[in-house]
């Protein structure tokens, strides 16, 4: 039995469940928003492997810290996770992600964890950086709470209460391509790049959740090497790697341990089956 843990349903959840069952394996969904769910000190489930589609993050109205507490409780009961919970946490924390990637030689935007405007200005002065700059919540998801400051006045406004929001300031990587912005999502499953696409938007936030569109991407050997290295140093079995191109260089901005599959399905790439095969492989090992 494989269990998919999620805060809420969605096309990726149900497509993945079907792919697992089509391969002859039982699959259950642990829906953490269910009215029938009771998590007391005796809470446990019967399963051979848990694939969490939850992270710890700032989703506004979604179950986040609660989800994380449930997952950690199940880990304490001896359950096995793909991806590991440590990997999920490290990828949820954008500052931790950037730290790990940069220490392993991957190109990332200059980044600092800030408490207030004074910290933000100190960072800009120390790194000799100019506007614009990006501010984001370290645990933000789906392109939410990502903002651009173009001046001191805007920075002062956007950096207010940063210490209470775990906010980052980050170098702005201008990846505009003509009249649009195009970044890249590459999917790694069990040490293999299985596909990728460009995310296209009229602004610098390209996430599909906030309206970005997709187009096919031919994953070059250089991009493949970057994606595989990201997955390896993050200890990820299933990972979406987000990359910004600029002046012939590639900046890794985020990694995602619960990448959506809808975009790949629209391009005819059956990544649900590949993820299902990965989960079944480690369930049986």
Swiss-Prot record:
Cofactor descriptive note: Binds 2 manganese ions per subunit.
Catalytic activity field: oxidized coenzyme F420-2 + L-glutamate + ATP = oxidized coenzyme alpha-F420-3 + ADP + phosphate + H(+)
GO biological process, one term: protein modification process
Keywords: ATP-binding, Ligase, Manganese, Metal-binding, Nucleotide-binding
Annotated ATP binding sites: 136, 170-183, 199
A Pfam family this chain is assigned to: RimK
Claim: Metal-binding is one of the keywords in the record: yes
Domain called ATP-grasp: residue spans: 98-284
EC number: 6.3.2.32
InterPro entries documented for this protein: ATP-grasp (IPR011761), ATP-grasp_RimK-type (IPR013651), ATP_grasp_subdomain_1 (IPR013815), F420_CofF (IPR031039), Rp_bS6_RimK/Lys_biosynth_LsyX (IPR004666)
Cofactors, names only: Mn(2+)
Annotated binding of Mn(2+) 1, by residue: 242, 254
GO cellular component, one term: cytoplasm
Residues involved in Mn(2+) 2 binding: 254, 256
Family: Belongs to the RimK family. CofF subfamily.
Function according to Swiss-Prot or TrEMBL: Catalyzes the ATP-dependent addition of one alpha-linked L-glutamate molecule to coenzyme gamma-F420-2, producing coenzyme alpha-F420-3. Thus, caps the gamma-polyglutamate tail of coenzyme F420 with a terminal alpha-linked glutamate.
NCBIfam families cross-referenced by the UniProt entry: F420_CofF, rimK_fam
Subunit structure: Monomer.
Protein name per UniProt: Coenzyme gamma-F420-2:alpha-L-glutamate ligase
Species, as recorded: Methanococcus maripaludis (strain DSM 14266 / JCM 13030 / NBRC 101832 / S2 / LL)
Gene name of the encoded protein: cofF
